[in-house]
């Protein structure tokens, strides 16, 4: 989860998960196909915050980068995918105010014809993707992941 209102200083006003209802919560509809769900309703449930899912305020986006851009513009609070927010998290434009994260169980795979993974250009691509994914792992250090 990441938060910004033009500056990470907004996170200083968010001390507990119970502080989030009533704020503008940016919603990524592209996660609706993921089971278990990775959305505000699921996050509030595991955080122990009693919120009616139909009462969760905020715009819904059907392109994954749109809620990220909205958060970066100060439009609300984002439950973001680390893969899409890594740079902004590292440079401080977005912050993770809580140690609780949802795990989706969704995975990405590289698929190629058998043996093609040994070709130099494909092997280099696989190595690059693997290193990029590994670089996001340290952002998860010390976080509680709940399915």
Show which residues each predicted segment covers.
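C-terminal effector-binding regulatory domain of bacterial HTH transcription factors
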Residues: 82-87, 91, 101-147
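Flexible hinge/capping segments at coil-to-helix
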Residues: 1-28
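Secondary-structure junction motif
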Residues: 26-47
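Short helix-loop capping/hinge motifs at secondary-structure junctions, enriched
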Residues: 6-16, 33-34, 115-120
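Hydrophobic hinge/microswitch elements
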Residues: 49-96, 103-104, 118
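Structured beta->alpha junctions
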Residues: 29-32, 59, 114
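Alpha-helical segments flanking ligand/cofactor-binding loops in enzyme cores
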Residues: 18, 68-69, 123
